[in-house]
């Protein structure tokens, strides 16, 4: 089974491609996490977990869900992580998670996809994003080849920098940066509730037709990037930046 969590659908796209290539079922962790569903999942022997990279590891909400949820029938697990640039030493923590779940760790693969973390970085415009997705195809094909053969992924890079970013920096990043406090709406907001719908942690509700953010945010960027009116800002850091979600690339090419 292919499990995935996603913010702006990079991971959903990769998971769908992998599931199609392996003829495996696809399992949406966003829906489970949003519903608070930790019931056992019948996965079969092989599990592929596809996630974005948050602070140089898999998202904390995913590792927490995995810790609470029995993967019935699972014996082996592969991790596929998409990122804007690097995953650090995420593989070391994925190995620990596999051991915790008593699963054979089959490796971690990194695939570069378009950046969406506009709370800190710049997202590409659609034309550039399409190019990045095209450039990701060889890496995706290598992942599929290994998975079809039941082989381990090659060990990723691991150096002092990687261990530092995934190690001490990760909890510091969550503590000081992963907060919803800076989210706000502009006058363009129409109160459609798309942000409420997309938030995997139920951290947004409408008051007087306007979104209000709570304290339980994972910085997935779904709210700000899916807003149809681009009426959400993250303080001053997102002003003027392109919004990115994968579905926009599947529409008619930009004129």
Report the location of each language-model feature:
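Long, positively charged, glycine-interspersed low-complexity recognition regions
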Residues: 230-255
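Short low-complexity, flexible loop/linker segments enriched in glycine and/or proline
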Residues: 41-42, 121-123, 220-222, 248-252
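FMN-binding flavodoxin-like domain, especially the glycine-rich phosphate-binding loop
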Residues: 1-2, 6-14, 20-32, 37, ...
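Conserved short-loop catalytic and cofactor-binding motifs
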Residues: 50, 82, 128, 186-187, ...
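Residue-level preference for short coil/turn positions at secondary-structure junctions
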Residues: 42-44, 73-74, 179, 185, ...
